[in-house]
Amino acid sequence: MAPDLAQESKFNYAAHIRYWRRNLKTFLPHHYTGNDANRMTFGLFILSALDVLGDLPGALSAEERQGYIEWVYNCQLPEGCFRPAPATHFGAGRNEENKIWDPAHMAGTYFALLILIVLGDDLQKVKRREILLWLTKVQKPDGGFGETLGENGVVEGGTDSRFGYMATGIRWILRGSLEGPVDGVPDIDVDQFVECVRASESYDGGISEAPYHENHAGFASCAVSALHFTDRLPVPKPDGRLRGVTNLQGTLHWLASRQTLTLDEEDAIDTYKDETDSAATCHDAHSFVKLRSYPSTAGELSFQEKPTSHFELGWVGINGRINKIGDTCYAYWVCQPLQLLGYLHIIDRKPIRRWLLDRTQHVVGGFGKLPGDHPDIYHSFLGLMVLSMFGEAGLQNADAALCITSRARRHLESLPWRRELLGMSGAETSVQNPVGSYVSMSGG
């Protein structure tokens, strides 16, 4: 049955507060056991979610807040950077031989810094120089970044833009978008990183893990965010600096095309070996959209060949790849780069909001991946971030690139040491959106 468009979908504020406080104050369900090494990531999601909800002051006492800050610093390594969880902390037993099993970690460092910012720390105890030097060591010859350093300084980890996003995010937190050596510390090779992003851009504007791979909204989001942090997004007038997103109109079209009416598993049918499966039509997915119900009453009338005027869709999901089902997390991975590029307005937020609130919002709070799924920390946080970007009443404004509130970002930008560092070169403390209304969607 289609949604009643006259009935406003409701964000269950109280349930979300309870959900996130439970995640903060109690043991997580056993399903999270295999993610013990990701505690720093979960910590950021939980604390930032409470901040977005405006509940952080009420959820934490001053003593608890300080305790979490100390917990994060306990994960800082002697040589700089952070471990992603206490599990690899050897304490006094750590030595030159076994420290390879307790390495500096890209995600651990990025999320540790963000937690400290959300909690109002001044980052004075962060080994900033050591972290910035480490970033130059984990940059690969092609310009991308790894996850950690292995034996003999070999860069290890994936090859996609997630690590570039976190590396440039760390760099922006600690030194802004200044280029070149700062305070005697060398910089990463920004031009080479931009080349790496450009090489992963596809013919249709999407961005993939690596050249000639399948486009993916998550990689597009991370790449656009990294270009945002390095002030290398496209600008109306070339300024001589190498910039990414070389086909802006194509990228916007690809992102906007991730809107879908395939909202759950029952909306698709397997066509493998049926009459539609021929040499001309065969592909790897073997599925077509099947709507059990229509997105609106007017849509059903239109399908039955009855004349209708333009109608508003009831629910619209967002997927991350072509021919995939709508997924809560991809609402963030698509809307976030659109906002950073200055084009969030090219999608209709209303049916996306209804999809999130009517279909994936859970009765106990949080969001599931798909309709009917239990809520989890990852999807619940990203769903909340999307609603904040949409201006949901009762939610704090979010900084889409950093995944924290605008309040937390202002705290970072107010820190005296950072203002002094950036002022030394006359740099601005904030990265502004350089794209504006650079491109028209007509002809896309």
Segment roles from a protein language model:
Residues 1-444:
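Preference for long, amphipathic alpha-helical scaffolds in soluble/luminal domains
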